[in-house]
């Protein structure tokens, strides 16, 4: 039995039945990382000793017949912008190279409380800015389905770790599609929860009104398991909602008969690969066969979402990243004459090109004379986009679309074409701007590469997403796919 290919719920079953020890599971994953990660590039840091120590503790509890917790013995990888006490937290940036976190993020605390085994920190686009993980300052992450292709981004390492069987579960962050798009490219399941469903405390900020921590897993049940474990109110993050967290597993098997699904024409227009369109349309038919009522709908302001997103997120990034100045921690240039020179050279040398591009754009739209023309207008557009979604959700339980207009593209193909790279998130960005939840799951294969189906629902309706996603998933075999790597 290859333990690395099993889902979290399968591992839980064999652990509780004492068919395997937590230490065996952990060592199997550490061996897998040592074997393949030099080619896949998922990890920036591996916590081998700590993981084995934690696994032995769990085995001791099992020996005493103590009740297992939600994540007991399950190997988890954490994106390298989420704090784990005692581990590096670099955001895949030279400017934070060598920085070790002195505390746990709220989501990390919850994983530890539920006895998940944290294997290490995962590769990403620098400061979560990118759609291919080519913007990492340290190494490339590659798609397990085809090493010449990108895994998506910015949570590329998180997707690769699960798809490449280097972790059972992982955490990413999603600002404009950074969990869903790599999940689509790598053939796994990824959730962007409602803004405020999961705490951002201890997560390095990119766009504070957009960022959300998102769980990733091999199937829908795994994703639901991790979401239930980490969601909920956090007094250290005032944007979290004081709403009860349901046991999402209970929503999986409910009948979807009578669920109303909208198909927005704006998500099926120009730029969508025809083979991707066909895969998504076939998935919609499966949902219809399972009892859902499918009708067309319209979200007319979606054409403005990408522009609004890049103005708002870049403005927030320019403010959030001002703290990285080479003074208190992180990279400091050695070639400086005075204090001003430290700031200038440390940031110029420490940040990568994409981060600098967004800082400059954000600073520009917040500057006197341009604030009203760009930033203020973008906020107005955002409000209208939210209203658009609210109007549609009065008539529909969910909306279905492609996750990305294409399958995974080749490494280097879009690196120098900024607009083409940004357009790879055209179907995920509107959801982030509105703050509603969405899930991506595999719905087909094109030339050996996975295709992602995106299901979107109203605020705090993650249970609806899991219900519809599970109904589709169990009707097809795509969730059983594993990259032959």
From Swiss-Prot:
Signal peptide: none
InterPro entries (UniProt xref): Amidase, Amidase_CS, Amidase_dom, AS_sf, GatA
Subunit structure: Heterotrimer of A, B and C subunits.
Keywords assigned: ATP-binding, Ligase, Nucleotide-binding, Protein biosynthesis
Single GO MF descriptor: ATP binding
Entry annotation: catalytic residues: 79, 154, 178
Domain of life: Bacteria
Pfam families linked to this entry: Amidase
Descriptive protein name: Glutamyl-tRNA(Gln) amidotransferase subunit A
Reaction it catalyzes: L-glutamyl-tRNA(Gln) + L-glutamine + ATP + H2O = L-glutaminyl-tRNA(Gln) + L-glutamate + ADP + phosphate + H(+)
GO cellular component, one term: glutamyl-tRNA(Gln) amidotransferase complex
